Amino acid sequence: EARGFGVSRILFPMINEAIIVLENGIASKEDSDTAMMYGANHKMGPLALAELVGLDICLAIMETTFTETGGFKYRPAPPLQQMVCAGLLGQKAGEGFYKY
């Protein structure tokens, strides 16, 4: 029996990596989202999806999964922590990676 829901354990490392890619200047938020939509046939990109879920919820899930598993891939990227602390939570706050 494994801790955490299967979808969360697959989805949140992808969201986390998209944040790291953005932070490191490898790709823009738009490029990352577009790449996953067209390259992987996802209905929306990882950053747009994170903002739909709520960046605070994403952070809480990553922190819990990281604590429970110790898996480095679940350790929240620092920009996510900073954004949540600043109240930039995504769609419900009107701003996150994107403005709504």
Q: Where is each model-derived feature located?
A:
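NAD(P)-dependent Rossmann-like dehydrogenase/reductase catalytic/cofactor-binding core
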Residues: 1-5, 13, 19-24, 28-100
